[in-house]
């Protein structure tokens, strides 16, 4: 399944970046933008949010699910001092869960709908796809911060 390949590819690349040194983790992709460290923490939190949304739709049916404030997470969890090892563990576990859920539910239950508090009606399939594309979007930012060329997938 294409979604599983996308989830695996973005996972494998993301996990490599958790091993960077302090100077690379402090790099940003532009003035006033998040550092690689912040992006990695954000990816872990986003994986948890994607997981919660998908599980709620599978278990509780159509409902309104609220947007999460990524800047509030960065401040409230203090991304600057939060151990990156914690976020690595969260990211790896949440991605394993997402992959498991996608393997069993992407085709069979991908049509199930829910309502995003800002963007409206979405399907489970769209949320799985969003998790992979969101990860890829931030990987592109990390590559830019590190001076790496864009990847062609």
Please tell me what each predicted stretch does.
Residues 6-10, 15-20, 74-112, 129:
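Acidic/histidine-rich alpha-helical segments that form the ligand environment
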Residues 24-70, 109-153:
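Short, contiguous alpha-helical
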Residues 1-4:
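N-terminal export signals and maturation junctions of secreted/periplasmic proteins
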């Amino acid at each position: 399944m294409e979604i599983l390949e996308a989830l695996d590819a973005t996972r494998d690349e993301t996990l490599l970046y958790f091993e960077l040194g302090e100077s690379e983790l402090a790099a940003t992709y532009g003035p006033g933008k998040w550092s690689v460290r912040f992006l990695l923490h954000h990816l872990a939190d986003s994986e948890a949010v994607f997981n919660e949304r998908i599980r709620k739709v599978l278990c509780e049916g159509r409902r309104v699910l609220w947007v999460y404030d990524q800047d509030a997470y960065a401040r409230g969890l203090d991304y600057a001092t939060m151990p990156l090892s914690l976020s690595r563990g969260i990211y790896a576990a949440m991605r394993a869960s997402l992959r498991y859920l996608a393997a069993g539910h992407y085709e069979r239950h991908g049509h199930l709908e829910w309502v995003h508090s800002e963007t409206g009606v979405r399907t489970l399939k769209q949320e799985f796809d969003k998790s992979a594309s969101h990860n890829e979007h931030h990987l592109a930012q990390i590559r830019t911060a590190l001076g790496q060329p864009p990847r062609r997938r």
